[in-house]
Amino acid sequence: MSNPLAVIVGAGPGIGAATARRFGSLGYDVALVARDEARLTELGTSLQAAGVTTGWTPCDVTDEARLTLAIERFCGHSGRVDVLVVNPSRYRAQRSDETSAADLLADLAVGTAPLLTAARAVLPTMRAQRTGTILATGGGSADRPFPGAATLGVQKAALRNLSLALAEDLAPDGIHVATVTIRGTVAEGTPFAPDVVAQVYADLAEQTASDPAGWYRVVDLTADGVVPVG
């Protein structure tokens, strides 16, 4: 039987890389998708050097067709997909009254829409398995707008709502969908370090094997630890 597969969309040097390493350490094969080819290759080769079976594809996550194809190829090659983590967002240093509708839509295309695209790409395989975990990186700006970066909170609020909609719709198929609201700045040596976030994701994936009635759909990562809120 093949190893479980974790697909990381938005596999940057912080949370994405830490999440890939964590699932790799748990015996998962890892598939990486991100726009920066050089960083992606560096992460992929480092995982391979650590003994993790790893594949990667550079891709602009706003390109629905390319992102879908990349994920479908990973699923087809592995014959399964167990965990999907969707991590992208865009920080735009603009106040709300300086932001155009085009700016807002462009940022939603990075920070929200890839969750839907990626989820739809893994659904045929997860439904056939009758199990799977879909996880999305949220942020406290979803309900507490970040000063001077109006679109960030809109991305995260929409992401949470979309995650909850997917959770409701997919639970009957055995698919656990959850979002982690990071209520602080992601930085090493803090309660919001990338490795801490990665462990929360690993714990949520493990929870998928339990009774769906007890699945967490929204959890807050606070300075005091993990708080289930829905």
Enumerate the language-model features and the residues they cover.
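C-terminal helical subdomain
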Residues: 172-230
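Rossmann-fold cofactor-recognition segment
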Residues: 47-65
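Catalytic loop of short-chain dehydrogenase/reductase
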Residues: 107, 133-158, 164, 171, ...
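Conserved NAD(P)H cofactor-binding loop of Rossmann-fold oxidoreductase domains
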Residues: 85-93
